[in-house]
Amino acid sequence: MNICVISGSTLGGAEYVAEHLEEVLKTQDFSTALFHGPELDDVIDENIWLIVTSTHGAGELPDNLKPRFEQIAASDKDLSSLRFAVVGLGNSDYDTFCHAVNKVETQLSEKSAVKICESLKIDVLHVDDQEQFAEDWLPQFIHAL
């Protein structure tokens, strides 16, 4: 089984978390592919997505991920074979805290993709080691596979 780790980041925090989770998955003998803001054609046929994203601006996806989800929303592709989970990074000082997670969940669910576990929302104001925090959540994702 191949796990497609997809990151969307503005300042790099989500990329670091995605890279860390991919390394942890590799040490547990999972086959992985890591994409930072991929082209949709690169990942659309994969069956398992682990999306790590920050929230940008007024609750938006980062610029390197937003166009892909706009493509998904505009397409008529059935994603019922896709299983996914989302890790989000955000700042709870904003009322749009981790709103990008909600956008990913909504857009994928509207295309019949299946969320396999609860999303993780990391508050960068209160969590100093975001990579470890995400790693501590990872068994939920693995168990759901």
Each predicted region: which residue ranges?
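FMN-binding flavodoxin-like domain, especially the glycine-rich phosphate-binding loop
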Residues: 7, 12-19, 24, 28, ...
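Extreme N-terminal starter segment of soluble prokaryotic enzymes
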Residues: 1-4
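A short, well-structured beta->alpha microelement
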Residues: 26-41
